[in-house]
């Protein structure tokens, strides 16, 4: 029979034999596989090194929880003393809060008492382009108030009540004389919203009931005299 292997055409160097070619093929295959294995080993080694570095970095980034506050001292404080000291802290806070409440209440009381010691009212005058504000608590009598108003509005003529007319209730004759002899007369608005002549009630009652003062012309205040006398009689 014909030996096909012997007659098979092969590419190779002259003088080469089949065994050498097979050996070359085998050697070539082994060289490729070894190269692939070497690359795989290198890549796995690199991955292992990278993973180790990442793990170390992650460990460094992890922040440890802060340690609990402990009582520091020398000699060392025992555990039961620590518990006693920690239990006393809320008591100190409660005492501070109580002091704050006490100071707040005392401040409110002082502000209320300060408001009770002053009685500010606005003062206006017919024809005057400005307003004034006075504290009625600063004056003791109607005469003191009249003198103060005369100084505030010095360019206007305000009726002079005299030392006797301001102490007690003013009678009808005094009111009429006052309105007829003065260009301007001081009046006030009481708590009821009525306009009255200044001097129709005792000074303490006037300070408590006065909301504002208006110095109006005497001709416009004539109608206030009978009403003031009638209201004074009703109060008495």
UniProtKB/Swiss-Prot annotation:
Please provide, in alphabetical order, the Gene Ontology terms of the cellular component aspect for this entry.
Answer: nucleus
Compartmental location: Nucleus
Under the heading InterPro entries, the entry gives: AUX/IAA_dom (IPR033389), AUX_IAA (IPR003311), PB1-like (IPR053793)
Q: Where is the PB1 domain?
A: 118-218
Biased composition (Polar residues) is annotated at 85-94
SUPFAM superfamilies in the record, alphabetically?
A: CAD & PB1 domains
One family name in Pfam for this protein: AUX_IAA
User: Which superkingdom is the protein from?
Assistant: Eukaryota
Primary role: Aux/IAA proteins are short-lived transcriptional factors that function as repressors of early auxin response genes at low auxin concentrations. Repression is thought to result from the interaction with auxin response factors (ARFs), proteins that bind to the auxin-responsive promoter element (AuxRE). Formation of heterodimers with ARF proteins may alter their ability to modulate early auxin response genes expression.
Q: What is known of its domains?
A: The N-terminal half of the protein contains two conserved domains I and II. Domain I includes a slightly degenerated ERF-associated amphiphilic repression (EAR) motif which seems to be involved in the activity of transcriptional repression. Domain II is required for the correct degradation of the protein through the SCF-mediated ubiquitin-proteasome pathway. Interactions between Aux/IAA proteins and auxin response factors (ARFs) occur through their C-terminal dimerization domains III and IV.
Mind telling me what this protein is named?
Answer: Auxin-responsive protein IAA16
Lineage in the entry? Answer: Eukaryota, Viridiplantae, Streptophyta, Embryophyta, Tracheophyta
